[in-house]
């Protein structure tokens, strides 16, 4: 299930994805590994892992950022307060940014866009303010434009993301309960205008009941919902 343009997107369960470009830049989004019941057994991250992108501060999205970034000497990209928080936890290389901002990650242009979700980081000292939740648009030369929505509800300004960046492949949460479910994700797909949907944040835990099969019955004609399992590469 591999795309033909040279960019590979591997789903590692929940919202964790590995993006590998044709030029060899490797980007991991939302590292949830050790406690992720859907992380593919036996899968090993590439030794060269250039960047780790964080969408927000919840544990099921950042729990492995310190060991992963430390082992691979990765640069962590996150909203400013979250970048500062993981720096205090031991991450050496960070890029703090904010909504609407754009950074260059080798040949990849990464733009931080809005999401509608909470974003407190929890540890033994309590819950910490770490900025707001976000998504990312990734523009890669010779590749379809990618959108990782992070955790989010559907919101009208997804139409602005479509107008500004024209994402062609959208990674959307569909499980419901903590994010939008299939009904809302179908509306999000309509707002965004992407013709390929990669479903995330479903099936990991019992409350996340939405499925790609259900989403496929709700999207507009001509929109492909990829039916994948953790470990698959698109």
Please report, for each region that a protein language model flagged, where it lies by residue.
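Pre-active-site segment of Zn-dependent metallo-hydrolases
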Residues: 18-58, 63-70, 118-128, 152-164
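Zn-dependent metallo-beta-lactamase
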Residues: 1-26, 33-36, 104, 214-223, ...
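Active-site environment of divalent metal-dependent phosphoester hydrolases
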Residues: 35-36, 58-63, 83-86, 101-104, ...
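Active-site-proximal loop/helix segments of hydrolase catalytic cores
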Residues: 121-191
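Active-site-proximal beta-strand elements of phosphoester/diester hydrolases
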Residues: 8-11, 27-30, 109-115, 145-151
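Binuclear metal-ion centers of metallo-dependent hydrolases, dominated by the metallo-beta-lactamase
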Residues: 87-102, 186-234
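Active-site neighborhood of phospho(di)ester-bond hydrolases with catalytic His/Asp-centered motifs
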Residues: 28-31, 49-57, 77-80, 146-150, ...
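Active-site HxH/HxHxD metal-binding segment of metal-dependent hydrolases
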Residues: 41-103, 108-119
């Amino acid at each position: 299930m591999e795309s033909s343009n040279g960019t590979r997107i591997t789903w590692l369960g929940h919202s964790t994805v590995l993006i590998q470009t044709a030029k060899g830049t490797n980007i991991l989004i939302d590292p949830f590994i050790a406690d992720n019941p859907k992380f593919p057994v036996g899968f090993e991250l590439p030794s060269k892992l250039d960047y780790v992108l964080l969408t927000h501060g919840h544990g099921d999205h950042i729990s492995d950022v310190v060991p992963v970034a430390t082992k691979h000497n990765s640069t962590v990209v996150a909203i400013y307060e979250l970048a500062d928080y993981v720096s205090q936890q031991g991450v050496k290389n960070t890029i703090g940014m904010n909504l609407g901002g754009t950074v260059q990650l080798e040949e990849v242009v990464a733009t931080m866009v809005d999401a509608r979700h909470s974003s407190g980081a929890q540890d033994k000292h309590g819950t910490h303010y770490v900025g707001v939740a976000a998504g990312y648009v990734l523009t890669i030369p010779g590749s379809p434009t990618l959108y990782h929505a992070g955790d989010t509800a559907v919101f009208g300004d997804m139409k602005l993301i479509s107008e500004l960046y024209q994402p062609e492949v959208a990674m959307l949460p569909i499980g419901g309960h903590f994010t939008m479910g299939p009904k809302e994700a179908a509306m999000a797909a309509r707002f965004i205008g992407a013709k390929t949907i990669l479903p995330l944040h479903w099936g990991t835990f019992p409350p996340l009941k939405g499925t790609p099969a259900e989403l496929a019955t709700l999207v507009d004609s001509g929109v492909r919902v990829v039916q994948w399992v953790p470990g698959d590469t698109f």
